[in-house]
Structures are given as C-alpha cells and as structure tokens.
C-alpha cells in the first residue's frame, strides 16, 4: 500500500456524508460552530455561493453576503467539524463556474435568477 493510498483511506473516513448538493449560484445557510468560553453555539451565515473547489476532504465553498452595506466573503471547508449544518435555501441559475464579478456589482445588480429544475 503506497503512502497516497493510506492518506486517501484516512481521508475517506473523515468525509461527511450528509451534505446536500451545492452548486455555484445557490443561496445557502451555513451553521458555523462558535466557541464562547466553554460553550459552543451555532451561528448562521447566509449568502450566495460564488465559488466551489472540489478536492475530497479539502472541498471548499466561498459564500458572499452584504452586511450593512459591506460585502463579506467567507470560505468554508465543507468537511470541517466546525460546520454544523448546510441548508440550500434557493437554487441560482448562472452560466459561470466562479461568480467573482459579483464583487464589483452593487444593489439589484447582484441578484441571481432562480432555478427550478433542481430540487432543494
């Protein structure tokens, strides 16, 4: 057994199996575990998926939202223990793999058409 096969087998055990299908353009709500003192609480983060990187255990999504007039982007490792839940709220109809152009847009120009052919 080579070193790569050993690493893949260990990573396969760590993968989460209960993740929904997430596509670029979707509006998602990510529940992030935050530690305050000794307690953990779940903080929701809602926004549009503007980028997705596959790669086994290193799979990430970049979620963008506008908070108090300022664009905020966060990168989430999908298989991280800090991610409590991911819920798809709305499917978006886009024709790009990366939606970085949304960074330059303001207001109604950032809206994405809804897609109805994929289930939530």
Swiss-Prot record:
GO cellular component: cytosolic large ribosomal subunit
Alphabetized Pfam families for the sequence: Ribosomal_L19
Sequence similarity: Belongs to the bacterial ribosomal protein bL19 family.
InterPro entries associated with the record: Ribosomal_bL19, Ribosomal_bL19_CS, Ribosomal_bL19_sf, Translation_prot_SH3-like_sf
Function text: This protein is located at the 30S-50S ribosomal subunit interface and may play a role in the structure and function of the aminoacyl-tRNA binding site.
Name of this protein: Large ribosomal subunit protein bL19
Protein origin, superkingdom: Bacteria
BP GO terms, sorted: translation
Single GO molecular function: structural constituent of ribosome
UniProt entry keywords in alphabetical sequence: Ribonucleoprotein, Ribosomal protein
């Amino acid at each position: 057994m080579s070193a790569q096969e050993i690493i893949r087998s260990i990573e396969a055990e760590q993968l989460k199996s209960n993740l929904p299908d997430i596509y670029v353009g979707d509006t998602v709500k990510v529940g992030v575990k935050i530690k305050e003192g000794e307690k953990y609480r779940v903080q929701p983060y809602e926004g549009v998926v503007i980028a997705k990187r596959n790669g086994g255990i290193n799979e990430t999504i970049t979620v963008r939202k506008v908070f108090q007039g300022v664009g905020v982007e966060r990168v989430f490792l999908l298989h991280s223990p800090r991610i409590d839940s991911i819920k798809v709220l709305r499917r978006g109809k886009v024709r790009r793999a990366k939606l970085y152009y949304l960074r330059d847009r303001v207001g109604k120009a950032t809206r994405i058409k809804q897609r109805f052919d994929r289930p939530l």
